[in-house]
Amino acid sequence: MATIKDVARLAGVSVATVSRVINDSPKASEASRLAVTSAMESLSYHPNANARALAQQATETLGLVVGDVSDPFFGAMVKAVEQVAYHTGNFLLIGNGYHNEQKERQAIEQLIRHRCAALVVHAKMIPDADLASLMKQIPGMVLINRILPGLEHRCVALDDRYGAWLATRHLIQQGHTRIGYICSNHTISDAEDRLRGYYDALAESHIPANDRLVTFGEPDESGGEQAMTELLGRGRNFTAVACYNDSMAAGAMGVLNDNGVGVPGEVSLIGFDDVLVSRYVRPRLTTIRYPIVTMATQAAELALALAGKCPTPEVTHVFSPTLVRRHSVSTPTDTGHLSTTD
């Protein structure tokens, strides 16, 4: 891999001159710019975005990396961070990581190139060591929905395992023992922790786990449809299903309705997140509230404080989810008809 010294040698200039060209300094002559640019292209040299940005004066811009801004969950996150930016006189720049390591890196580097001194980052695919390196370079970078060992005080996260345990326990408390689970097929900690929470609740109540009652899909409505279709295809040996998120629950509910399976009379359904769709499906969805607005607000305020070198307490910011009772859960009945709803 080419270095800045290789570029200087090929261009016939000093390393300092290469640095001035990279940082767009007015002290760099046009001849130097041409020579350095040509050398960089010949060597396929890409200057470190972090080093360039840190060498320049930061702007009043708050950066945010999300999984996918079209997802209602991330839409709520964006709105919360935008409010913090507005009230503190900052602009907001947004990058999408799409749950892909390379795209997450590109989104972060793009925001750094725009000299965002404060960053709120939702990145699930970049390895811990690489994220830790980035956070050491960028004092105002805060992670949301992830805990990084050694940097816990710069992370804002949810106890996902507890949330899934809470959802499954609620179904058990209503009398269900044959409980399915629809899980995200993304290899991220959220999916792993929520699946563990489901199994925890079953084990705590001495209910044998049945892997045939667990299906996986994309964490959206179509993924929920596919997963519920698969569950039904295995035989309807369940009276309740917990879902990875509300979008999957909405898709699953649609499949149940299409197949003439009543919710909650024949199958109870519980989601996770408490996004907008949970209040507009019919029946309205019982779910687990993810306090994303509060969490995103705290993450943005923390990032700005760190970027401004303000003293902040070195505490772990882990939030606990809560149960939201609506109308998609009831007690199971032998006849499959509605008994009581919450």
UniProtKB/Swiss-Prot annotation:
Single GO MF annotation: DNA-binding transcription factor activity
Keyword Repressor assigned: yes
UniProt keyword terms in alphabetical order: Carbohydrate metabolism, DNA-binding, Galactose metabolism, Repressor, Transcription, Transcription regulation
Cross-referenced Pfam families: LacI, Peripla_BP_3
Span of domain HTH lacI-type: 1-56
Record-linked SMART domains: HTH_LACI
Annotated pathway: Carbohydrate metabolism; galactose metabolism [regulation]
Gene Ontology biological process terms, A to Z: galactose metabolic process; regulation of DNA-templated transcription
Residues within the DNA-binding region(s): 4-23
InterPro entries: HTH_LacI, LacI/GalR-like_sensor, Lambda_DNA-bd_dom_sf, Peripla_BP_I
Superkingdom in the source lineage: Bacteria
Functional note: Repressor of the galactose operon. Binds galactose as an inducer.
Subunit architecture: Homodimer.
Designated name of the protein: HTH-type transcriptional regulator GalR
Species: Salmonella typhimurium (strain LT2 / SGSC1412 / ATCC 700720)
Chain's gene name: galR
